[in-house]
């Protein structure tokens, strides 16, 4: 079982690649010793969506900003200034990734990407899975032997290519 006192913090090597809001949010999260799950429960969002917000990869609503201000004890005006714009997605880390867990996810796409594509094309036709009309979640499973397994669900709207 994971130690519940451990929380994810901001890797200092990423700070220059992330918006200023990331530093603000992560520092407040660490000060309060909050998990993404606990923040997500307060916001009514998934923990992955909240983590993406902290990394500047998703947009905060006015309600998110108000609740984050309360949860993290950060002035609402500061969060409005830092989170009020549009996210600059996809620039958080180097490509290919060097962080081992992120590299494993990249490796999954490298190894199974064409297999996923072939199966999805057979099931849905010619098109793509949206990463905009999209949701994801991470769950923990424990098997009969006590081994922990990570279960990542990716759910994206199917978008058929247009014929023109």
From Swiss-Prot:
InterPro entries: Cyanase, Cyanate_lyase_C, Cyanate_lyase_C_sf, Lambda_DNA-bd_dom_sf. It catalyses: cyanate + hydrogencarbonate + 3 H(+) = NH4(+) + 2 CO2. Its EC number is 4.2.1.104. The active site is at 104, 107, 130. It comes from the Eukaryota. GO terms for biological process: cyanate metabolic process. Keywords: Lyase. SUPFAM superfamilies: Cyanase C-terminal domain (SSF55234), lambda repressor-like DNA-binding domains (SSF47413). The keyword Lyase applies. GO terms for molecular function: cyanate hydratase activity; DNA binding. It is an enzyme of class 4 (lyase). It holds the Pfam family Cyanate_lyase. Belongs to the cyanase family. Catalyzes the reaction of cyanate with bicarbonate to produce ammonia and carbon dioxide. This is Cyanate hydratase. It comes from Botryotinia fuckeliana (strain B05.10) (Noble rot fungus). The lineage of its organism: Eukaryota, Fungi, Dikarya, Ascomycota, Pezizomycotina.
């Amino acid at each position: 079982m994971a130690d519940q006192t451990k929380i994810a913090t901001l890797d200092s090597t990423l700070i220059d690649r992330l918006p200023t809001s990331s530093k603000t949010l992560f520092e407040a999260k660490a000060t309060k010793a909050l998990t993404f799950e606990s923040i997500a429960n307060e916001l009514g969002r998934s923990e992955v969506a909240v983590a993406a917000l902290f990394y500047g990869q998703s947009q905060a609503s006015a309600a998110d900003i108000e609740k984050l201000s309360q949860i993290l004890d950060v002035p609402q005006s500061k969060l409005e200034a830092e989170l009020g714009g549009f996210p600059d997605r996809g620039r958080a880390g180097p490509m290919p990734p060097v962080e081992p867990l992120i590299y494993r996810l990249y490796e999954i796409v490298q190894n199974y990407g064409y297999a996923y594509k072939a199966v999805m094309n057979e099931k849905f036709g010619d098109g793509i899975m949206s990463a905009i009309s999209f949701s994801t979640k991470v769950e923990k499973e424990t098997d009969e032997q006590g081994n922990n397994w990570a279960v990542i669900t990716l759910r994206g709207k199917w978008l058929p290519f247009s014929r023109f």
